[in-house]
């Protein structure tokens, strides 16, 4: 997937799901299911409910995404 095809949005973690999946409420009110990116998983970045995150979405499926950044 090319970087230019990605839609990047801010959101808040609402719920933790099994297998490192999270339910994220985006700034526009939509709720998506997102998983942690490989670099965050490799560096053991912990994500908890209530954390502000940056999510990448593809234009093909706007209900799933990838968490690429956790704000402090």
From Swiss-Prot:
Subunit and partners: Component of the 30S ribosomal translation pre-initiation complex which assembles on the 30S ribosome in the order IF-2 and IF-3, IF-1 and N-formylmethionyl-tRNA(fMet); mRNA recruitment can occur at any time during PIC assembly.
GO molecular function annotation: ribosome binding; rRNA binding; translation initiation factor activity
Family: Belongs to the IF-1 family.
SMART domains: S1
The keyword Membrane is assigned to this record: no
Superkingdom field: Bacteria
Entry's Gene Ontology cellular component terms: cytosol
Record keywords, A-Z: Cytoplasm, Initiation factor, Protein biosynthesis, RNA-binding, rRNA-binding
Function: One of the essential components for the initiation of protein synthesis. Stabilizes the binding of IF-2 and IF-3 on the 30S subunit to which N-formylmethionyl-tRNA(fMet) subsequently binds. Helps modulate mRNA selection, yielding the 30S pre-initiation complex (PIC). Upon addition of the 50S ribosomal subunit IF-1, IF-2 and IF-3 are released leaving the mature 70S translation initiation complex.
InterPro entries named among the record's database cross-references: NA-bd_OB-fold (IPR012340), RNA-binding_domain_S1_IF1 (IPR006196), S1_domain (IPR003029), TIF_IF1 (IPR004368)
Residue span, S1-like domain: 1-72
Main location: cytoplasm
Localization: Cytoplasm
HAMAP family (UniProt xref): IF_1 (MF_00075)
Name this polypeptide is given: Translation initiation factor IF-1
S-S bonds: none
